[in-house]
Amino acid sequence: FLEDCQRLLADVANAEASVSAGGVRANGHLRVTAPAGFGRRHVAPLVPRFLAEQPEVTLSLNLSDRVVDLAAEGFDCAVRVGDLRDSALGSVRLADNRRLCVATPEYLRRNGTPRHPSELVQHDCLTLSSEASQTRGWAFRMPTQAGGAEVVHLKPAGPMDCSDGQVLYDWCLAGHGIAWRSTWEVEGDIAAGRLVAVLEDFAAPPNGIYAIFPSARHL
């Protein structure tokens, strides 16, 4: 997974170099935006290494769970986690992104373990607030009457929501409810027993982690 993340900044450098005649060495200032949690863990640590390899480049990193308008706000590249909606943007898929419902063992002992997504209404669900990027809710793979399966989006409620995914993660680790988080964030906690995955049989297929550019000419 780290290798996929390292490709991100290389893609940015190649994109900027490609708009120069003859593929001249990348130079100038890059503005990159990424989701706060993913950016802190996987993008920010790579910036110094990237700049060491590209000494004529400077870089500003914006971390926000808001969906940024690249063209209107002057960004050269965005990292997007999830489904892409704007087909006018150029994109490079970096890695798969799988999400799971997780909670602490203590929370599940107190409140029980949901066996079906419909039972989430009985639980304290920790959700991103409406101004964040997760507008469709939590995705689940549900059986159909025809014997197949379809992805259904639910918007569970709870006593707390936040626009910052790191806060939801912290609340979940503190035992305040069930959160729907990416495996890159919680797989270590699951392995260590700090968090337990629930409703795994209903987990939706993975979507993607992408590098997004204002124009396909960068690809």
Name the predicted role of every residue range:
Residues F1-D11:
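Basic, amphipathic "hinge/linker" alpha-helix immediately C-terminal to the N-terminal HTH DNA-binding motif
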Residues N27-S91:
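Central regulatory/effector-binding core of bacterial HTH transcription factors
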Residues A10-T33:
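Short helix-loop hinge/linker segments at domain boundaries
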